[in-house]
Amino acid sequence: MTEVNINVTEIMEALPHRYPFLLVDRVIDIAEDEITAIKNVTINEEFFQGHFPQYPVMPGVLIMEALAQAAGVLELSKPENKGKLVFYAGMDNVKYKKQVTPGDQLVLHAKFIKRRGPIAVVEAEATVDGKLAAKGTLTFALGR
């Protein structure tokens, strides 16, 4: 992989997501079919208002969404996919291993392992301080 520093402005050029649903802050490594990105988790995230006010924990499905968005940055930053959308079509073998709380930095790693036409399968994992927080297999459809 090639070490890079793709900032949030460039991420927003690839992804259609915006606050409060943009869950990728920076890309730090990228290759043809692999990406590593960062999500800095703060107490200011809207989901912490209800999940849970006295014990804020990032919902696991949003960790998986952050991983999906990281994979989306990789796919949508390719010139041939400019102007297209990536639709999250499913997730399998998802495991949550560590709670993610305010102050954590999620390191998001996604690797495309299979493609067939507009459908792609990605192996993804999120870590905090080098410890596995979540992992799973994501399926995408490239569209529009």
Curated annotation (Swiss-Prot):
GO molecular function, one term: (3R)-hydroxyacyl-[acyl-carrier-protein] dehydratase activity
GO cellular component labels: cytoplasm; membrane
Chief localisation class: cytoplasm
Group of enzyme by EC: lyase
Catalytic activity: a (3R)-hydroxyacyl-[ACP] = a (2E)-enoyl-[ACP] + H2O
Keywords for the protein's UniProt record, in alphabetical order: Cytoplasm, Lipid A biosynthesis, Lipid biosynthesis, Lipid metabolism, Lyase
Superkingdom: Bacteria
Family the entry assigns: Belongs to the thioester dehydratase family. FabZ subfamily.
General function of this protein: Involved in unsaturated fatty acids biosynthesis. Catalyzes the dehydration of short chain beta-hydroxyacyl-ACPs and long chain saturated and unsaturated beta-hydroxyacyl-ACPs.
Name of this protein: 3-hydroxyacyl-[acyl-carrier-protein] dehydratase FabZ
Protein species of origin: Lactococcus lactis subsp. lactis (strain IL1403)
